[in-house]
Amino acid sequence: MAKTAQEVMQLIREQGIKMVDFKMVDINGQYRHVTIPAQNFTEATMTDGIGFDASNYGYAVVEKSDMVFIPDPATAQIDPFCEVSTLSMTGNAMIIDYPHNRPLDQYPRNIVLAAEQYMRDTGIADTMLILPEFEFYLFDDVAWKVAPNEIGMSLDAEQAHWNGDINGRGVIVPRQGHYHIAKPLDRTYECRSEMCLRMEEAGIPIKYHHPEVGGAGQFEIEPKLGEMSKMADATMLIKYITHNTALKYGKSATFMPKPVYGEAGSGMHVHMLLLKDGEPVFSDDNGYSHLSREAHWFMGGLLKHIHSLCAITNPSTNSFKRLVPGFEAPVTVGYATSNRSAVIRIPAYAKTPNMRRFELRNPDATCNPYFCYAALLMAGLDGIENKIDPHENGWGPYDVNLYTLSDEEKAKLQGLPTSLDAALDALEADHDYLTKGGVFPEALLRSFIAAKRRECAAMAAIPHPAEFERYYNL
């Protein structure tokens, strides 16, 4: 919408903007924001920034926590969810220094930009295109409570199978039978369509939306391929728009990986490909599934580091309740064509050279997208730099349904981590590929791991309702 500070000022005048909102990202990948009256916004605001306390974002120690947020004019757009006319921008965080401020190397947006620069410096590629698939649930009612005498949750969705007939009109959605189901069974079409229109207005081209497998109200929105750093910004906006549009329709949206026991979990599969001088790096007519050796090495890097990557791509305890057999979620370290049981799937429909790619299927949207996408790029580049061949390392290709193998055959396969603690152990032991070129600071990784360890310990200490069912009367 705008590219320069002058264009932002012009937009404020022409649109009668009353407030200017600055959206920042914390260590968990959640928006925080600060708002100023538009009359106080000047071109100097774009260079001097807005001061904030970074210690509350999880980045800096309290003794050195004063930072400034520098808005990026290219991200300026009108926020459709504010009744008061509001212009919104995201941007980058800077450390206050003399004579010049310097970038906060722990800030997510700075990390994804540093990863892109590292890629260009290697000469391997100059652009990484990614396409995340956003799976989520829409609920009509959700509540939870964690107290000494009461621990539990409840949720409901109009089209959920446990509700049976809707309004006595024979509209029944079968359990696990929700995939691509049409009206009248698709009860949230208008809500999702408005989400996609809002995303398009925000400059995010959308490929499609549709009902997903989970009959309790699971859906998917898929954007088109985009440059990595821009897609990280877009990921934040897609979640923001999804949550706020759902509320407008009297519903609640969640990207939680496994909100419903016995139903399909929600992932964020990430398709990826590299370009150099506009030409595809991953295409080779003579390669397996028409992928080049660089593509295979990139996959090799992802597979070699997949255990440590899981701490970043699946950073919640709930993430690992999704990564179990039986729900089309990946559980095996390997690659294959058109095989959803392997963690890397090569889509057979991507036939043209500039579309040849693969998807990593384990990530979910509880991740910080800036950390996630940057980590995937760094792992893949490490694979290319060290020529890590996935076939030679025994990671496939697995052109069979891995879920149906015998127990003896499954025992030979390498599995994904089964808990966040295990993934954090792997990240502690294997993160040199992330710190190359100073892309991921050691201090950030230490604070991230420590915060997640505390999270794991806190979750483990809470009695679970299912424990009462199993152990109460022993």
Name every feature range the model reports, one short phrase each:
Residues 1-474:
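Glycine-rich, acidic/polar active-site loops that bind/position phosphate-bearing ligands
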